[in-house]
Amino acid sequence: MITIKKGLDLPIAGKPEQVIHNGNAVKEVALLGEEYVGMRPSMKVREGDVVKKGQVLFEDKKNPGIVFTAPASGTVTAINRGAKRVLQSVVIKVEGNEQITFTQYNEDELKKLTSDQVRQNLQSSGLWTALRTRPFSKVPASDAVPSSIFVNAMDTNPLSANPEIVLKEHWQDFTDGLTVLSRLHEGKLHLCKAGDSNIPTIDLPNLAVHDFSGPHPAGLSGTHIHFIDPVSVTKSVWYLNYQDVIAIGKLFTTGEIYTDRVVSLAGPQVKNPRLIRTQLGANLSHLTENELSAGENRVISGSVLSGNTAIGPYNYLGRYALQVSVIAEGREKEFLGWIMPGKNKFSITRTVLGHFSSKLFNFTSAVNGGHRAMVPIGAYERVVPLDIIPTLLLRDLASGDTDSAQALGCLELDEEDLALCTFVCPGKNEYGPMLRAALDKIEKEG
């Protein structure tokens, strides 16, 4: 077992009941273009077109053969674009249940699949987009070969669902998905799970099972990759989450794409925090209807630490999101707040009384201060368990020194890996966008 000692389990109120309930009816779904790093879409549909579930909506111009398919049947009601015509979202009003079917195999055939058969089915169905590379966190090229593949079957994000609860309903599909992934390449398939979980394993020649324990970010794929098979500019690995493995298993045994999602609907502003069954790309206004406390709320697709605000053309459940988190908008100002004892405030430092409390806090979107320079007081080192020097790395990201940042290990990271650094930063800096800018520059210029 790999035990993580550094990190932070955020003491946030609104933890979900670990029982799956049916969510509100899904009337509208969407694919969010900006989730796919570096993707340039070639549209295959127009507004007003009627599409089937599994039908191609757009293809990546930079990566021919990588298609993005409809998560439900219905009518394309909007294709939202932003500045410079960047694709924001393709919205579908859910109608009917027509769908496109793909190649189906029986369970005995799964262990005999060739890599080409696996690639063809994943790419034609759009499920290839469940895979992401490290470094750069992009959808892999159609002919790329990884050093290894990581399956994340644990989650230490605040307010997250327990994967074991979800997997109990789909164990056969999950093992089928692992079997399919083991046939995708000859390298290792790493299954990472919590040390105290009862997730059974399957006997596959190239499957390695790893147990992790400790505070967040022990459950992030970036942490797993760092300790098991670190990447470099010349070495790439792929990773995906456990619910996408279930979907892959169902695709190969039924010939149909599976877009159901079990997500945690939780946070201080949720009336009844729990796990709900919904659909990939679901409209979050519909999903949270009559579920939230009164007032101005911020709905987040994903974790409170690294998720995206669900608003306007982005008001949908993200492709990789397994959570819907809701906090209050913190717009009120506190006079001389820095001098008060702060028994109802949380800090990783011993500057407020809340640091010594075991209570859960009603966090809001307020950052409790204005932007200022980095202050190296050891806060970053407390929450980063990786074998890197976080203060120096963050300094290089802030200054745009990509050569030094690369030498210090930025290629191993994704935005979610620096989310805790953003949370504890005394200077209120957002390190995720800085990291993405550095990765884009490194990929472009080398």
Swiss-Prot record:
GO molecular function, one term: oxidoreductase activity, acting on NAD(P)H, quinone or similar compound as acceptor
InterPro entries from the UniProt entry: NqrA, NQRA_2nd, NqrA_C_domain, NQRA_N
Alphabetic keyword roster: Ion transport, NAD, Sodium, Sodium transport, Translocase, Transport, Ubiquinone
One BP annotation, GO: sodium ion transport
EC number annotated for this UniProt entry: 7.2.1.1
Broadest EC class assigned to this enzyme: translocase
Catalytic activity: a ubiquinone + n Na(+)(in) + NADH + H(+) = a ubiquinol + n Na(+)(out) + NAD(+)
Keyword NAD: yes
UniProt key word Metal-binding: no
Oligomer and partners: Composed of six subunits; NqrA, NqrB, NqrC, NqrD, NqrE and NqrF.
Family designation: Belongs to the NqrA family.
Role according to the record: NQR complex catalyzes the reduction of ubiquinone-1 to ubiquinol by two successive reactions, coupled with the transport of Na(+) ions from the cytoplasm to the periplasm. NqrA to NqrE are probably involved in the second step, the conversion of ubisemiquinone to ubiquinol.
HAMAP family: NqrA
Name of the molecule in the record: Na(+)-translocating NADH-quinone reductase subunit A
Organism from which the protein derives: Histophilus somni (strain 129Pt)
